[in-house]
């Protein structure tokens, strides 16, 4: 049997067969070696801050802690995950809370632990200031333009809810509540190209020139591209750093002080580390289509249904036979949900697309590649389906880092309520 198609993971098809025989399908598998490799690729930046929303398992966070990667949290739940994953909020801004809205319970938590807040709205400044004057804050700025691999991942411009539109409106509140302004942050979307990157760097310089307070840090945000297609070019990290470092030097010279440069990636660090393994349960034909139905759906991996995202798919035969790449079929790959949109091979407009795959049999496994980011963290219980296991390949061993949710656990919040 051939190894995994597409690249990267250090484990083999035989390893996957052993895992599914023990834990069943569907399931997630991550390779820690790839995560560590991606961390090292960003070593030129002063601070790497992981966008936890992309993959929030506490054992993944423990791995980041080991390599001195800090955390960006966007909810109370993510703050709690960071706390249980060894991060200490009093230690050199280990955790920053980023949001455009802050609920009362979350506000109480960030005040309790003195967590710096990356503030994305003027109303938040007032709400935080009344409870915690003198708090350490960042300002998230909307540079009035954005870009992403999908309209839904564009986080800048007048159609985006994210960030402060006019930085000048923030200054009276900073003075009124004696906030300590640490830095400025910009993130215009997921999947940023170099043309837009240059605009962001210039926009950051312009915002600092407007700022009435001397900051210490600038954040490049995230958005580094990931090569989901086999022929995609990986992002040039050196060029990415060069552009931001150039902006940092201009800002440092203007403020006459050292400026720390942070980057806040999510997908870049974890996407390529993960796979989703599913079993083929049905192969059906219509006049013009062949449909392959697997036991995972958009309740597990929602990116194709939500964004039209592409994930490379490879085949692992259940019986260990060799894959014959000369004997192929053109098929639509779907999940089990009672939902027409539960299709893994569709574009951003919802148009059904086919994928050329080796001829498969019932019981074979499909592997969806590059699902380490926004896979498990965006999964749900839709159709009352339990959350699936997560497995981490670390130190040449496979470790279960989330067991399969039981039906009892799924129903527990509702039983005995009345």
UniProtKB/Swiss-Prot annotation:
One Pfam short name = Orn_DAP_Arg_deC
The record's GO molecular-function terms, alphabetically, read: diaminopimelate decarboxylase activity; pyridoxal phosphate binding
Cofactor entry: pyridoxal 5'-phosphate
User: What reaction does this catalyse?
Assistant: meso-2,6-diaminopimelate + H(+) = L-lysine + CO2
Q: Does the keyword Transferase apply?
A: no
Report the Gene3D superfamilies cross-referenced here. Answer: Alanine racemase, Lyase, Ornithine Decarboxylase, Chain A, domain 1
InterPro entries given in the database record: Ala_racemase/Decarboxylase_C, DAP_deCOOHase_LysA, De-COase2_C, De-COase2_N, Orn/DAP/Arg_de-COase, PLP-binding_barrel
Does Zinc show up as a keyword for this record? no
Q: Which family does it belong to?
A: Belongs to the Orn/Lys/Arg decarboxylase class-II family. LysA subfamily.
Subunit details for this protein? Answer: Homodimer.
State the name under which the record lists this protein.
Diaminopimelate decarboxylase
Q: Which gene encodes it?
A: lysA
């Amino acid at each position: 049997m051939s190894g995994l198609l597409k690249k990267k993971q250090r484990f083999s098809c035989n390893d996957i067969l052993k895992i599914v025989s023990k834990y069943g399908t569907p399931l997630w598998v991550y390779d820690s070696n790839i995560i560590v490799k991606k961390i090292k690729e960003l070593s030129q930046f002063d601070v790497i801050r992981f966008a936890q929303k992309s993959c929030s398992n506490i054992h993944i966070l423990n791995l980041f802690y080991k390599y001195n990667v800090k955390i960006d949290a966007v909810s109370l739940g993510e703050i709690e995950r960071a706390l249980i994953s060894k991060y200490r909020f009093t230690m050199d801004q280990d955790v920053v809370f980023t949001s455009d809205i802050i609920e009362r319970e979350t506000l109480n938590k960030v005040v309790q632990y003195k967590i710096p807040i990356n503030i994305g709205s003027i109303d938040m400044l007032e709400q935080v200031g009344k409870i915690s004057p003198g708090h350490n804050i960042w300002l998230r700025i909307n540079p009035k333009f954005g870009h992403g691999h999908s309209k839904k991942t564009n986080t800048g411009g007048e159609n985006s809810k994210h960030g402060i539109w006019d930085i000048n409106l923030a200054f009276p509140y900073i003075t009124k509540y004696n906030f300590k302004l640490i830095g400025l942050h910009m993130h215009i979307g997921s999947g940023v190209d170099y043309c837009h990157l240059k605009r962001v760097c210039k926009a950051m310089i312009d915002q600092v020139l407007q700022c009435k307070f001397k900051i210490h840090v600038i954040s490049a945000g995230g958005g580094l591209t990931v090569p989901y297609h086999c022929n995609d070019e990986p992002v040039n990290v050196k060029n990415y750093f060069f552009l931001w470092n150039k902006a940092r030097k201009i800002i440092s010279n203007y403020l006459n002080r050292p400026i720390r440069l942070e980057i806040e990636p999510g997908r870049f660090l974890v996407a390529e580390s993960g796979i989703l393994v599913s079993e083929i349960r049905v192969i059906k034909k219509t006049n013009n289509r062949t449909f392959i139905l697997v036991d995972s759906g958009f309740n597990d991996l929602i990116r194709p249904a939500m964004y039209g995202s592409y994930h490379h798919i490879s085949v692992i035969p259940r019986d260990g036979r060799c894959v014959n790449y000369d004997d192929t079929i053109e098929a639509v790959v779907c999940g089990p949900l009672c939902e027409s949109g539960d299709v893994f091979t569709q574009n951003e407009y919802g148009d059904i697309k086919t994928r050329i795959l080796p001829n498969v049999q019932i019981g074979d496994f499909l592997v969806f590649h590059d699902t380490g980011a926004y896979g498990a963290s965006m999964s749900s219980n839709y159709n009352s389906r339990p959350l699936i296991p997560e497995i981490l390949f670390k130190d040449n061993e496979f470790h279960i880092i989330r067991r399969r949710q039981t039906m009892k656990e799924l129903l527990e919040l509702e039983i005995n309520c009345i």
